Amino acid sequence: MTDPQRLPLVTAPTNRYDSSTVDAKLVNCFAEQGQGRDEYYVYKRPGFAYRSSVPAGTARGLYNWNNNLYSIIDGSIYKDGFLMSAALNNAGVYTFAPCLGATPKLFFKNTTNAYTIDGAGTVTAVTDINYPATTVPGSVYLDGTTYVFDAEANIYGSDAAGNDPTTWDPLNLIVAQIEPTAGVMLAKQLVYILAMKQFYTEAFYDAGNAVGSPLSPVQGSKMNYGCVDARTVKDVGGDLMWVAN
């Protein structure tokens, strides 16, 4: 008499073919071995469900804000698939930064134009003459102020007192100048603003300065890693990742 054969617990045998010599098939999941030799766990794979659609065109930005999906296609912005405005600048890639204030807004920009949209879907162009004419990708909201960055390594800030990304203070300016390389991307890590340049990265924090920019450089924080391309910068679960120079 032969010894009894131990069958796997995680799946039933012969559920793919009639032969018991062929392993079972896991659909939309995967198995991993646990701490013990005979421990196995089955995990469901992440899945996607249809939510909304937008017209065909060049995708320029996508962002989830307050459980609503905002997408920019060509020169139009959609909220959960519904058109909010067709008057955007139809160029480049848009980046986003949620803002607070009396009326919370979503600030979004490409390299030449900036806009806000509120929860009601009202889109407003930033027309303040103090907003820089050209910027690099990325925008950051920190302690009531919205910041943008340009290729000359200037960090511009909105009116800190008003908590309004449509109003920009001409004195709210600081330069990432430890090294003389061009600005590539502005990002945020925890409570710090990262000025990513071609070959170096510099960090700033909100020092609450009464005059000029509220920001001050974090002493000793210079990193000898720049950014190859702004589109490689991603925040993954609080960890900032990018392709470095």
List where the protein language model places each region.
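Acidic, glycine-rich loop-and-beta core segments that form the ion-binding/anion-interacting portion
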Residues: G208-N245
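N-terminal beta-propeller domains
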Residues: M1-M84, V136-F204, G208-N209
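Repeated scaffold domains used in trafficking and secretory/extracellular systems
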Residues: P55-Y63, N89-P104, N130-D143, P180-L186, ...
